[in-house]
């Protein structure tokens, strides 16, 4: 119900910023993006925040750029203090709002922020939050009483994901943070959906479901398919979570042991394309690794035999999209929209 009010307030503020000449380059610095990353971790944010913030930073300029490494560093030092689902187990965003909202959360975690960063209000972040109050410390926890001692997200790397992959450990069963299991591989979303509904599917809770061809180019558009459904056979046995790996995304309200954003994606020949059903995969979230348990020689042999899929588009917007879209680790933006792609674009001539 407050969205129209907030939209109107944003519109008024944008007009005021024009009159104040408070332009994006006066606000967006790397420190702002690092503040945003730390706040996202404390919030128990969506995995999509990684893609958005990386893309925004790369548009803001080379001096502002953040990477998966910045998220990994933040995830090791900033605890989750917003006790809301899916990281929390009881409260919703409405409860968060009435507990003090974002200003209160930022005040609670101010030790992890640079207070001198300029904001769209024309004031620093420190000035913005100085009078904020927490009205319910079970919803917005003190740092000493965090619901999860490390950040909401973890960045994994290994021979399956040399460019990185992402998991939300605060929203998955603890037993899957260190796990080795056999892969069950699907090359398309329809194939996966059909298989998981088969009550005779050869699958156990220890299996790792793998969905590929769901990345930026393979999807196309990196759809939110990453929260793969638990096979019906296992659901009837009471299983509610299992490891799942894909080059897709998932919604911020989704949960489970889902490893997402595998980069480079399988559609362009990333190592995820080389995984076979039955291969053992080891995931070690505390040590930030994800590994296909085969030799480098075997991996090279599979790569040599890999055949690229036929192009999805040969003309039009789909062709342009496939040609210019970046991988997840680089923000899934068009390469030509980054500031380092070419010279600045001048204002158009008006005749």
Question: Which residue ranges define each predicted feature?
Answer:
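Catalytic or ion-coupling anion/metal-binding cores of large enzyme and transporter domains
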Residues: 1-266, 270-351
């Amino acid at each position: 119900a407050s969205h129209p009010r907030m939209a109107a307030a944003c519109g008024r503020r944008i007009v005021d910023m024009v009159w104040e000449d408070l332009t994006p380059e006066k606000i967006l610095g790397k420190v702002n993006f690092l503040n945003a990353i730390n706040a996202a971790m404390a919030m128990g944010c969506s995995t999509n925040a990684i893609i958005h913030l990386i893309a925004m930073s790369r548009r803001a300029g080379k001096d502002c750029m953040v990477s998966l490494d910045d998220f990994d560093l933040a995830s090791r030092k900033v605890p989750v203090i917003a006790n809301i689902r899916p990281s929390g187990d009881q409260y919703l965003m409405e409860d968060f709002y009435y507990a003090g909202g974002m200003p209160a959360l930022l005040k609670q975690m101010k030790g992890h922020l640079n207070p001198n960063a300029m904001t769209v209000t024309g004031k620093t972040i420190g000035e913005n939050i100085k009078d904020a109050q927490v009205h319910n410390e079970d919803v917005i926890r003190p740092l000493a009483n965090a619901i999860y001692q490390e950040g909401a997200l973890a960045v994994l790397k290994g021979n399956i994901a040399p460019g990185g992959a992402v998991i939300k450990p605060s929203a998955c069963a603890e037993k899957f943070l260190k796990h080795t299991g056999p892969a069950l591989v699907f090359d398309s979303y329809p194939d996966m959906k059909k298989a998981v509904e088969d009550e005779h599917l050869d699958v156990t809770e220890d299996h790792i479901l793998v969905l590929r061809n769901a990345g930026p180019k393979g999807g196309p558009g990196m759809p939110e398919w990453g929260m793969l459904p638990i096979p019906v056979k296992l659901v009837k046995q009471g299983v509610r979570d299992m490891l799942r790996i894909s080059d897709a995304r998932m919604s911020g309200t989704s949960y489970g042991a889902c490893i997402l954003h595998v980069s480079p994606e399988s559609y362009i020949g990333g190592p995820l394309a080389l995984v076979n059903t039955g291969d053992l995969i080891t995931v070690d979230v505390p040590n930030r690794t994800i590994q296909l348990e085969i030799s480098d020689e075997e991996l090279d042999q599979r790569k040599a035999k890999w055949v690229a899929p036929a192009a999805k588009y040969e003309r039009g917007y789909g062709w342009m999209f496939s040609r210019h879209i970046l991988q997840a680790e680089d923000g899934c933006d068009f390469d030509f929209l980054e500031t380092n792609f070419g010279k600045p674009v001048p204002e158009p001539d008006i005749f």
